[in-house]
From Swiss-Prot:
<dbReference type="InterPro" id="IPR017896">
    <property type="entry name" value="4Fe4S_Fe-S-bd"/>
</dbReference>
<dbReference type="GO" id="GO:0022900">
    <property type="term" value="P:electron transport chain"/>
</dbReference>
<dbReference type="InterPro" id="IPR016463">
    <property type="entry name" value="RnfB/RsxB_Proteobac"/>
</dbReference>
<feature type="binding site">
    <location>
        <position position="49"/>
    </location>
    <ligand>
        <name>[4Fe-4S] cluster 1</name>
    </ligand>
</feature>
<keyword id="KW-1278">Translocase</keyword>
<comment type="function">
    <text>Part of a membrane-bound complex that couples electron transfer with translocation of ions across the membrane. Required to maintain the reduced state of SoxR.</text>
</comment>
<feature type="domain" description="4Fe-4S ferredoxin-type 2">
    <location>
        <begin position="138"/>
        <end position="167"/>
    </location>
</feature>
<dbReference type="InterPro" id="IPR050395">
    <property type="entry name" value="4Fe4S_Ferredoxin_RnfB"/>
</dbReference>
<comment type="similarity">
    <text>Belongs to the 4Fe4S bacterial-type ferredoxin family. RnfB subfamily.</text>
</comment>
<dbReference type="GO" id="GO:0051539">
    <property type="term" value="F:4 iron, 4 sulfur cluster binding"/>
</dbReference>
<feature type="binding site">
    <location>
        <position position="120"/>
    </location>
    <ligand>
        <name>[4Fe-4S] cluster 2</name>
    </ligand>
</feature>
<dbReference type="InterPro" id="IPR017900">
    <property type="entry name" value="4Fe4S_Fe_S_CS"/>
</dbReference>
<keyword id="KW-0997">Cell inner membrane</keyword>
<feature type="binding site">
    <location>
        <position position="157"/>
    </location>
    <ligand>
        <name>[4Fe-4S] cluster 2</name>
    </ligand>
</feature>
<keyword id="KW-0004">4Fe-4S</keyword>
<comment type="subunit">
    <text>The complex is composed of six subunits: RsxA, RsxB, RsxC, RsxD, RsxE and RsxG.</text>
</comment>
<dbReference type="InterPro" id="IPR007202">
    <property type="entry name" value="4Fe-4S_dom"/>
</dbReference>
């Protein structure tokens, strides 16, 4: 019985010692992040699209801060993001890069081919917003109002019955920018 307690104490002391060493090393050898990179990364839209030529927003922010990369290459962010970065870095705003056009991608929604769905629930487990409804061995359905089009449910599906399809724009789904609609105000006295 004493041998068990000695072994437990020895393993506990080893764990405590290694924990203390790791804690010290994490503080002693900590790498400081560049605050300018952090601020640029916060401004970028975080779409991780790669249209700027970098694999994501963070590498593009590092290239802007450290390597002097152009600030006008973010297509999803467009002119608004470029102006914020120019203000942050105190540089002249630049026109959008010819290749980087401000695009508003069509909203995509997952669609399940219910004839091929085997009800495995792998897509339900993968969906981060719980937009898929169904049960084991029962066909599943996507609630299009909740679906963000993130594409995370497509790969886990063993029968490949899930696809992303663009949502048709209707007057109900259109995002109206009321500031750009010309409005003429008619004085009240002319209404009678």
């Amino acid at each position: 019985m004493n041998a068990i307690w000695i072994a437990v104490a020895a393993v506990s002391l080893l764990g405590l010692a290694f924990g203390a060493i790791l804690g010290y090393a994490s503080r002693r050898f900590a790498v400081e992040d560049d605050p300018v990179v952090e601020k640029i990364d916060e401004i970028l839209p975080q779409s991780q699209c790669g249209q700027c030529g970098y694999p994501g927003c963070r590498p593009y922010a590092e290239a802007i801060s450290c390597n002097g990369e152009k600030i006008n290459r973010c297509a999803p962010g467009g002119e608004a993001v470029m102006l914020k970065i120019a203000e942050l870095l105190n540089v002249e705003p630049q026109p959008l890069d010819g290749e980087a056009q401000e695009l508003t991608p069509a909203r995509m929604v997952a669609v399940i081919d219910e004839n091929n769905c085997i009800g495995c629930t792998k897509c339900i487990q993968a969906c981060p917003v719980d937009a898929i409804v169904g049960a084991t061995r029962v066909m599943h359905t996507v609630m299009s109002d909740l679906c963000t089009g993130c594409n995370l449910c497509v790969d886990p599906c063993p029968t490949h019955c899930i696809s992303l399809q663009p949502v048709a724009e209707t007057p109900d789904s259109w995002k109206w920018d009321l500031n750009t609609i010309p409005v003429r105000i008619i004085p009240v006295e002319h209404h009678a």
